[in-house]
Amino acid sequence: MTVRLFLAKGREKSLLRRHPWVFSGAVQRVEGKALSGETIDIHDAQGKWLARGAYSPESQIRARVWTFLPDEEINIEFFIRRLQQAQNWRDWVAKRDGLDGYRLIAGESDGMPGITIDRFQNFLVLQLLSAGAEYQRAALITALQHCYPECAIYDRSDVAVRKKEGLPLAQGQVVGDLPPALLPITEHGMKLLVDIQQGHKTGFYLDQRDSRLAARNYSAGRRVLNCFSYTGAFAVSALMGGCTQVISVDTSQAALDIAKQNVELNQLDLSKAEFVRDDVFQLLRAYRTQGEKFDLIIMDPPKFVENKNQLAGACRGYKDINMLALQLLNPGGILLSFSCSGLMPTDLFQKILADAAVDAGRDVQFIEQYRQAADHPVIATYPEGLYLKGFACRVM
């Protein structure tokens, strides 16, 4: 018999608006015993059926909705349908942007909560981030093999958020060949190397594709500083755009080594590229002291906000680092500044940049706004899916 979760009175409004999460505080009672991740039916306080989802007893998100259709079962066929729906959109994006690497499944926004799947050529890279996703692992992999028989599957569920779901970290080969140490993919005419096994996230930041193209369009004749460069995709884009010099800064020598390989792979002028292993905050202060100036600065830091308690400190960090960047720009220079923190609202991030400009003593115009690329959609009922935000700021 299916386990039933009943919401407290008045707590059904978010589900009626088709938001896919049920928080622990909204739960009145659970009838029956469910394993972690098992499929349950969700009802309002009067017993009306609302949704079918995955139960997660150890998480603040007590249930994640698989479907709002009462007759839809959660099985292999369900995952095949979801994959096919997602692929229809990715086919269009891949053709438009010349891609062989893209996000295939973006969790809740593709109706598959807690599941991230990136495709790099014929390798599918999984991240199963919730108890429900882990519980459905076998069904999902069977569905992937049905839809993508040509693809190997690799698991990168080595993500700390799994601990909040009571899950161990997981990584390794699932189906087919191991990915090579570095796998080349293509976007907007660039070739970029992906480290699936050891790289950040699933190996590469696919979400910044549109921003990399924007950087290319701003680069002609400019001296560029690429902060938190990782494997240098922004640097390659800047060189393709005709920059006079690009300096890439990261704390990881391994990432900088791949960045250099990316420049060489695209047969670009290596003499225009410099790779600096350093702390970005310290280097920006040193550059300010030395009187260094740039015409384009790319500021793409890692996530500063992991929970709401860190938001105030993150605001200070974002303001300080962007203030330093703005002080290094020539008049007419451009700062492309990003936040990948889902807990950082777009309007607050824009205010932080405005405050940074005041503290830097620079008059700044906002000229463009960015978000994650189109293969990272945001379903209308789940605004939390919009996590990446960015602005192009022009110094007057």
From Swiss-Prot:
PROSITE patterns: PUA (PS50890)
Alphabetized UniProt keyword annotations: Cytoplasm, Methyltransferase, RNA-binding, rRNA processing, S-adenosyl-L-methionine, Transferase
GO cellular component, one term: cytoplasm
Subcellular location: Cytoplasm
Alphabetized InterPro entries for the sequence: PUA (IPR002478), PUA-like_sf (IPR015947), PUA_sf (IPR036974), RLMI (IPR023542), RlmI-like_PUA (IPR041532), SAM-dep_methyl-trfase (IPR019614), SAM-dependent_MTases_sf (IPR029063)
GO molecular function: RNA binding; rRNA (cytosine) methyltransferase activity
Catalytic activity entry: cytidine(1962) in 23S rRNA + S-adenosyl-L-methionine = 5-methylcytidine(1962) in 23S rRNA + S-adenosyl-L-homocysteine + H(+)
Residue ranges annotated for the PUA domain, each copy included: 2-81
CDD domains named in the record: AdoMet_MTases (cd02440), PUA_RlmI (cd21153), RlmI_M_like (cd11572)
Summary of the function given for this chain in its UniProt record: Specifically methylates the cytosine at position 1962 (m5C1962) of 23S rRNA.
Family of this protein: Belongs to the methyltransferase superfamily. RlmI family.
Record's protein name: Ribosomal RNA large subunit methyltransferase I
Coiled-coil stretches: none
Pfam families: Methyltrans_SAM, PUA_3
EC number per UniProt: 2.1.1.191
Gene field: rlmI
